[in-house]
Amino acid sequence: MFLAQEIIRKKRNAEALSKEEIQFFVKGITDNTVSEGQIAALGMAVYFNDMNMDERIALTTSMRDSGTVLNWKSLDLDGPIIDKHSTGGVGDVISLMLGPMAAACGGYVPMISGRGLGHTGGTLDKFDAIPGYQTEPDSALFRKVVKEAGVAIIGQTGDLVPADKRFYSIRDNTATVESISLITASILSKKLAAGLDALAMDVKVGSGAFMPTYEASEELARSITAVANGAGTKTTALLTDMNQVLASCAGNAVEVKEAVDFLTGAYRNPRLYEVTMGLCAEMLQLGGIASSEAEAREKLNRVLDNGKAAEIFGRMISGLGGPADFIENTGLYLPESKIIRPVYADQTGFASAMDTRELGLAVVTLGGGRRKPGDALDYSVGLTKVCALGDEISADKPIAFIHAQTENAFAEAEAAVKKAIHVGETKPEKTPEIYRYIRESDL
């Protein structure tokens, strides 16, 4: 028998906790036998004194096991259960293409996603822009769509990882969100509860990233790779660039449109293509579908070019209650803003830097993101045709188009976009889309 206060005391004194102590505390978080004050105290003790790798693995697996852990064996699937998770960014629409692409190559992708908060967009919010799409189906429908389409992208259900829900809300209110150990456990407990064989982790770097510096992003990527592999799920983390908007747009309906254009081949933003291919190729290799990056890329390009990935995206949407002809008639179903107008820079030159976080917040001020949890969204608003770093900016070339509902909202977003996109005299050096891969062998 353990006492919560003795576990807190140990961590306060910078001692390592045993697996059994961590399991006891997490059970207490779930069944309310540990108080909010005790949870806050442990969070602060971990924030200051950290956890070693064994503690992180124990915390992650205990939280994973605090609720239902999905098991796919009864479905007799003929491929691996694979997924990807991103730390979040602006214009990060990767999941919408990557899930169908991986499924078209023979994987099964039960993707449990989140909503946007702060400056980052949420995958579920994008799907909410599609009429009829159920982001919270019952378990039977979720499993049916995963089996039949190969991919289903839905929200977290109440029976998955209840310990994280309670722990995270307390961390959010007590300034302990930024602990690498606690971030690792929060992310991975949710992902691993989906019963995955393999995971590709997209850790963003730059002005639109969750972590403030490259070093912090790399530390998180290393922690996630070590803990996930330690918990029995093959995982690689990629450090990817978020110093500019990833797609050509940011918002909800506008990003769904770009995802459909990508899958059908109407338009593929080169930066978005590189990061999507990098993550998806890693998933195929970890899942044993491809034995090399070259083979994985060849398979992925084939399912893009022959339309199979687009067809699977359509099958997932109709399977979860959306329109059966969504791919063919995307424009009929997605909402559109009253005002769609260009923004011009005040000077000419080159797009030299971007405050990506501020661009994400501009979408929030338009109504496309949340100021606080539970806020209703306007799915039609956002930014499109956002310039890329290095683009030449002239007096008649817009730096972006704003989709707004009112003149006031347009004016506010216009000022924010002009401030966030810096125009300089010299063309900036090109940054890589993917800085590095962190595999288990690199640790």
Swiss-Prot record:
Record's catalysed reaction(s): thymidine + phosphate = 2-deoxy-alpha-D-ribose 1-phosphate + thymine
Alphabetized Gene3D superfamilies for the sequence: Nucleoside phosphorylase/phosphoribosyltransferase catalytic domain (3.40.1030.10), Pyrimidine nucleoside phosphorylase-like, C-terminal domain (3.90.1170.30), Transferase, Pyrimidine Nucleoside Phosphorylase, Chain C (1.20.970.10)
Cysteines joined through disulfide linkages: none
Example GO molecular function: thymidine phosphorylase activity
Enzyme Commission number(s): 2.4.2.4
SUPFAM superfamilies named among the record's database cross-references: Nucleoside phosphorylase/phosphoribosyltransferase catalytic domain, Nucleoside phosphorylase/phosphoribosyltransferase N-terminal domain, Pyrimidine nucleoside phosphorylase C-terminal domain
A GO cellular-component term linked to this record: cytosol
Alphabetized UniProt keyword annotations: Glycosyltransferase, Transferase
UniProt pathway annotation: Pyrimidine metabolism; dTMP biosynthesis via salvage pathway; dTMP from thymine: step 1/2
Function: The enzymes which catalyze the reversible phosphorolysis of pyrimidine nucleosides are involved in the degradation of these compounds and in their utilization as carbon and energy sources, or in the rescue of pyrimidine bases for nucleotide synthesis.
Family classification: Belongs to the thymidine/pyrimidine-nucleoside phosphorylase family.
Complex and partners: Homodimer.
Record's protein name: Thymidine phosphorylase
